[in-house]
A protein has these predicted regions:
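Class I S-adenosyl-L-methionine
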Residues: 1-109, 113-114
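Beta-strand/loop-alpha-helix module characteristic of Rossmann-like adenine-cofactor folds
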Residues: 1-5, 103-104, 112-146
């Protein structure tokens, strides 16, 4: 089983309870090292295998997931914020679907929500705006060449 887990906006105490429990139970954690606070790895059990995906290609990440599934081990794929928002998980889920590997998604607190909390602001105001548009600059996080 592969669990896609949102790490939240950075502070270790802002990960969800479910996300923390999955990290504590995982046999393997693959985390986005260039983006995820490494303090979250302190939740891992002593014999957990940990990979920094910033140093891996997509195929290498998928190979680890496949190996763990074959060994009946639980993998957490730890993404920054919420994995469904700019997390690039679709390509991973498509590959897992093709291989018949089960997975689920545990949402995280996205940084745009964390920013509103820090600023004591709200994004929607009655009679003013009921719309939130989330966008970012074009581009991808660099990955190693195959």
């Amino acid at each position: 089983m592969v669990h896609f887990v949102g790490a939240g906006p950075g502070a270790p105490d802002l990960i969800t309870r479910r996300g923390a429990a999955l990290l504590q139970a995982a046999d393997c954690i693959i985390y986005a090292g260039s983006l995820v606070n490494p303090a979250l790895l302190g939740l891992a059990k002593a014999d957990c295998t940990i990979y920094n995906s910033a140093e891996m290609t997509l195929e290498q990440v998928l190979a680890v997931m496949r190996q763990n599934e074959a060994a009946r081990k639980t993998t957490v794929r730890l993404h920054t914020g919420d994995p469904c928002l700019y997390g690039a998980i679709r390509e991973q889920m498509d590959a897992l679907d093709a291989d018949g590997i089960p997975y689920d998604d545990t949402p995280g607190v996205s940084s745009f929500c964390g920013a509103a909390a820090v600023l004591s602001a709200e994004y929607t105001l009655p009679g003013v705006s009921q719309t939130v548009i989330i966008t970012r600059m074009e581009g991808r996080t660099p990955v190693p060449e195959d």
